[in-house]
């Protein structure tokens, strides 16, 4: 028998050295069960115990150092005795006890370190080395892992993305240089997923919400009362709402799209997890949701006498949630960790979100219409937002996203947005000028937020100044606009002069391209501060001295290419080529030898070096002081900057919609108010198109279709085979409705749109395994929700009902639902169905009309035209569709035979119209 070989050091079956080939016995194949049992007995396998990370650390520590004594208490901050710890570790444990649920990064020299359990955890999360540190004679080694201080933000971003909160303990003073002298350290930052403000931790075009939920203590679904408040700390936006019933709360929670959700107890968290186990909640038991505490916190934070002025009167649940949110933010706010700091998280007055002033789009409808992400892959590309977003700023992109979440009901507000788009469409020059202004505009909302929190860099302030300097040119553009405009345009017409003065102040004090590291200096202009100018003059003198010293040493040594250079570790030194070593004078002191270079120092250079360092240090400190004062000035203008930024964001969103209109031939729709009893007109669209599908069909022409809910015919029965375009058509109507109510133009040749108070969809269904509901039960639950909540002003889009049960049960349910919608609710409805029998409803109800997807049949081949025409289809074409899918011919023939038999026995005696 020949033997197979395992060839080492080579993955491609050719050994580098035949002696390195290790021979093994050929592996037997096709063993029976008995053979496998014998094999198991011949070579029994040993059970391996699971090894957690702490045990692995112990094992590695012992193997690396045989003399280490393992002490169980040294692996957890909870069990270690603080009396036995070194002063530094005692301080670490004290801080960790105050932040049990957060990772603590503790500054030691050039690293931020973690110890005990945190070290083991971050070594795994960040894939960094787990090592050890001596914590005292009686404790011995403890786990340690750390990251370089200059890379701390990048590593924190990774931890935040994994939904961890981080506490930063930094050095509050520089080392004195005396070994053994303790350095003052303290918490300078608490970073949680919902409170990050750093640019690298945020998604530029998306809000980063933190939410707090107050939940009443009730026992039944419908009796639960709740309040939700959510804030974007980076932009200052604050929204609050309240409601009743757990089912509505669960839907709102999914729509929150929050990075962090705060609740006040484990009981509340456990109850909310039942609604959606995929969402993580932060339990903050020290956060108070009491009504009295909330009243005090809100009035104190916003500096108001009562809650009526901000719309919270009699909204106790919303008030409680807002109080809880402010309480939580107060506890983790960096400014509260530094009592002398005047900086804080700055939030706008709360926007009260009522159900009666916005188009309500529940989570299921958002998902079915693929408003912000695709349904199957959860991708941005292929969503409605993707198809219309042509914004130039991050502020504008976030604004457009918010508009899509909450479209308008007020036709006057919609008209005003349309008027901005009309102005842009009527003047290409106006459009291009605005594009050029906004193209390089910084994110003023978040830049101001960083300044307010004390984290803005010099480059952030420069970006703020550059943005504010564009305000006069934006004003001149707005003044050219015609028609009735939104209120926010007044801010751009009447610019706060203080903002322009602020921009000038920043430009006067900061250089155009300041360094990234603010401790290096070089960020403040000359002529800003007399003391700084004096220090810089001295530095220039010493620089001139160094040049003269370099010339002098060249003459003494006769080395023409000699240079005096600087190294951050060695200071100033004389550098010469190694070939010139024999020319080095005796007063030179050798400092370092490199491959092609020799480095020396002299007593004169060393003497001057100390003085240069002192002056540089004083100059850098002075620059930092001037910069911090400037940053505080900017922080005081945070609300004004953010307010003007929101106006710019709205302008950008509408500019983007105008560009979308130009690119895709959108038109301005006419509007019918929601409570207009003077007209019987309803939604009518000529040559409407699906904005998403049309853009995805790059090589094909989209087939446009008409739709009309006229003459009180509120319900449309839409029939046609699979893949013919029914789902695309009903989604198309929903998308056009949303576009209309955000103020956009729409993809059609002509459109008259009745404003809707809510959009309901029931499109497709799958098992809900988490709640144990079958496909049919999910479908029926969604249908029940629509029938119980829809009003005559709603838009209902149904794609199949009754598929998960028997044919006659399903048909009966679909029939009854259709009649209920047409007769009782009387809202605009499209019902796409395979039950062509539903076409007969038109004969019994004047509120119902039939439409079908036109299909041509040629020699048993289906040809889809994707055209929607009046009249019902008398065939479902299911067998033909099965044939197209590749079902065997024998099955197809049998299906035809069965169908003929069923149709003869169950034929309804009506003519389809």
Curated annotation (Swiss-Prot):
Signal peptide: none
GO molecular function, one term: mismatched DNA binding
Keywords (A to Z) from UniProt: ATP-binding, DNA damage, DNA repair, DNA-binding, Nucleotide-binding
Taxonomy, superkingdom: Bacteria
Pfam families in UniProt: MutS_I (PF01624), MutS_II (PF05188), MutS_III (PF05192), MutS_IV (PF05190), MutS_V (PF00488)
CDD domains membership: ABC_MutS1
SMART domains xrefs: MUTSac (SM00534), MUTSd (SM00533)
UniProt GO cellular component terms: cytosol
This protein's record includes keyword ATP-binding: yes
Protein residues bound to ATP: 720-727
Gene Ontology BP terms: mismatch repair
InterPro entries listed in its UniProt record: DNA_mismatch_repair_MutS (IPR005748), DNA_mismatch_repair_MutS-lik_N (IPR007695), DNA_mismatch_repair_MutS/MSH (IPR017261), DNA_mismatch_repair_MutS_C (IPR000432), DNA_mismatch_repair_MutS_clamp (IPR007861), DNA_mismatch_repair_MutS_core (IPR007696), DNA_mismatch_repair_MutS_N (IPR016151), DNA_mismatch_repair_MutS_sf (IPR036187)
The keyword Transmembrane is annotated on this UniProt entry: no
Cited function: This protein is involved in the repair of mismatches in DNA. It is possible that it carries out the mismatch recognition step. This protein has a weak ATPase activity.
NCBIfam families membership: mutS1 (TIGR01070), PRK05399.1 (NF003810)
Protein name, per record: DNA mismatch repair protein MutS
Organism: Prochlorococcus marinus (strain AS9601)
Gene: mutS
